[in-house]
Amino acid sequence: MHFSIPETESRSGDSGGSAYVAYNIHVNGVLHCRVRYSQLLGLREQLRKEYGANVLPAFPPKKLFSLTPAEVEQRREQLEKYMQAVRQDPLLGSSETFNSFLRRAQQETQQVPTEEVSLEVLLSNGQKVLVNVLTSDQTEDVLEAVAAKLDLPDDLIGYFSLFLVREKEDGAFSFVRKLQEFELPYVSVTSLRSQEYKIVLRKSYWDSAYDDDVMENRVGLNLLYAQTVSDIERGWILVTKEQHRQLKSLQEKVSKKEFLRLAQTLRHYGYLRFDACVADFPEKDCPVVVSAGNSELSLQLRLPGQQLREGSFRVTRMRCWRVTSSVPLPSGSTSSPGRGRGEVRLELAFEYLMSKDRLQWVTITSPQAIMMSICLQSMVDELMVKKSGGSIRKMLRRRVGGTLRRSDSQQAVKSPPLLESPDATRESMVKLSSKLSAVSLRGIGSPGTDASASDVHGNFAFEGIGDEDL
């Protein structure tokens, strides 16, 4: 996740109190919460007591007198670096102290009282699931509530996640982000104040081998089936006419497992597809459609002759990647804290091993660049878990201080309608992919600047590449 503090505000205290400076914390370019310096100082003290001062990043010191505008800007930059460093630290960033602070701050900023509400969660096929939750319930609480409503077993909950999406006019989903442990889903979706934004349940893993675990259960099987049919209908999974005929026959027979077995062999099965964007590969300002899955990023582009081409970039051949953001200022203006800021431009850049001795940077410019980066990192994490012989099943945190009463009614996952005929142009897809090797890193840049070498962090997945891999 990309944390930033792009702006500050001068606000009046409660009941006419003295004015203070508020720091607006953004996550992936969207306002998450508004906090005072004293609140962040309190968070630092809590982390220091719990983990010790040695592990904490540098924090801007207190000042005896009121800050000048230049000092406010300097403190903003220092606090931004502090929040980014804490979030990227495996220990601090995953701590309940840090995450609960962000949840409380989000709720306070949006002024949402704690109360029981009905929250709508969509399945991949558009089916609605209504769950009773508290406005203060975190992401895992809501995920558990959805699983309970669907009768999905506890040991399969970790195979699914909640995603914030924007529903487009044609009914397709544009992925905004995967909901995280530091946010409150009800507050996150309602604070956007638009009916376009929805919460969707999808599987959270990339390796189709894990499908076997999910398919053992009736509800898990239905969820995978519904997602796969939906992805095929949207053109996210590439299907030839003959494959489409076989799938339709299996669907008519309600042979869900056989349907999924065939779907697993199809190109882009289990991928997330992003909105059309621009890349500098194979040439500058090239319009592409990016998909993530199966340990790779796929870039589809249409050549002048209307033929579709695809370039596949294996995550294990990416030496590093970074996300950078820039905010263009109006022509002739100068930088001023919190003023004159335009729309944020996001870029994902990765250094790719094109051949044994040749590395090349590939840059994708997209509002969804951070989501793409998160997908890359989760694919690396999954590869490392599998390499170490681990499992993606996880122990779920249980509520402290009581449970929220859930409805006992169950909602079956309906079978989707029969598949429509595939687009004939999909058969002209030509794949340009590379063999597997093993390199991966991650990094993220500061707002308004290019990432420097210090922004790129190592990953234990590095194994090198040999002649046989090329």
From Swiss-Prot:
Taxonomic source organism: Pongo abelii
Gene3D superfamilies listed in its UniProt record: 1.20.80.60, Phosphatidylinositol 3-kinase Catalytic Subunit, Chain A, domain 1, Phox-like domain, Pleckstrin-homology domain (PH domain)/Phosphotyrosine-binding domain (PTB)
Protein family (similarity comment): Belongs to the sorting nexin family.
Main localization of the protein described in the UniProt heading: cytoplasm
Location(s) in or outside the cell: Cytoplasm; Early endosome; Cytoplasmic vesicle membrane
One cellular component (GO) term of this entry: cytosol
Pfam families associated with the record: PX, SNX17-27-31_F1_FERM, SNX17-31_F2_FERM, SNX17_FERM_C
Subunit and interaction comment: Monomer. Interacts with APP (via cytoplasmic YXNPXY motif). Interacts with KIF1B. Interacts with the C-termini of P-selectin, PTC, LDLR, VLDLR, LRP1 and LRP8. Interacts with KRIT1 (via N-terminus). Interacts with HRAS. Interacts with ITGB1 and ITGB5 (via NPxY motif). Interacts with CCDC22 and CCDC93; the interaction associates SNX17 with the CCC complex. Interacts (via C-terminus) with VPS26C and VPS35L; the interactions are direct and associate SNX17 with the retriever complex.
Functional summary from the UniProt entry: Critical regulator of endosomal recycling of numerous surface proteins, including integrins, signaling receptor and channels. Binds to NPxY sequences in the cytoplasmic tails of target cargos. Associates with retriever and CCC complexes to prevent lysosomal degradation and promote cell surface recycling of numerous cargos such as integrins ITGB1, ITGB5 and their associated alpha subunits. Also required for maintenance of normal cell surface levels of APP and LRP1. Interacts with membranes containing phosphatidylinositol 3-phosphate (PtdIns(3P)).
Disordered, as annotated region: 400-425
InterPro entries: PH-like_dom_sf, PX_dom, PX_dom_sf, RA_dom, SNX17-31_FERM_F1, SNX17-31_FERM_F2, SNX17/31_FERM, SNX17_FERM-like_dom
Domain PX: 1-109
UniProt xrefs under PANTHER family: SORTING NEXIN 17 AND 27, SORTING NEXIN-17
Residues with PTM Phosphoserine: S336, S407, S409, S415, S421, S437, S440
GO molecular function: phosphatidylinositol binding
Name recorded for this polypeptide: Sorting nexin-17
Region (FERM-like): 115-432
Region (PTB-like F3 module): 270-432
Residues given in the record as a 1,2-diacyl-sn-glycero-3-phospho-(1D-myo-inositol-3-phosphate) binding sites: R36, S38, K62, R75
Every Ras-associating domain range: 115-206
GO biological process: endocytic recycling; intracellular protein transport; signal transduction
